[in-house]
Design a protein with these regions (language model features):
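A short Gly-Trp-Pro
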Residues: 1-106
């Protein structure tokens, strides 16, 4: 996305099930580390599969009735829009999924 911030959730791939609209799911494989899914009707971003991490990120707008409360900022080393919200800011990803786990100051 071209937005300076995007809201997504990270899940283990086996926990994600598409319940409706599979016929409109397009795919763009950007490389070995990401496999993007989008809606072929509207172009909306649905998810990104991260095979090397064993995770899939699903955009909040693709989830219905999901009580979203942000918990962390990821890839904050690349931010162009500093956020002063009290949430932890990780340089990249948590160490548990292959990132540095390094936090950055607000």
């Amino acid at each position: 996305s071209a937005a300076p911030v995007s809201a997504f959730t990270l899940w283990k791939k086996e926990k994600v099930v598409l319940t409706k609209g599979a016929e409109f799911l397009g795919r763009f494989k950007g490389g070995e580390i990401s496999d993007r899914r989008y809606c072929t009707k509207c172009g909306g971003h649905i998810s990104v599969d991260h095979p090397t991490l064993g995770l899939i990120d699903v955009r909040i707008g693709a989830l219905r009735d999901f009580p979203f409360k942000p918990k962390v900022h990821l890839n904050y080393a690349e931010t162009i829009l500093p956020m002063r919200d009290g949430l932890p800011k990780l340089k990249d990803f948590p160490a548990a999924i292959g990132g540095s786990g390094e936090t950055l100051p607000e």
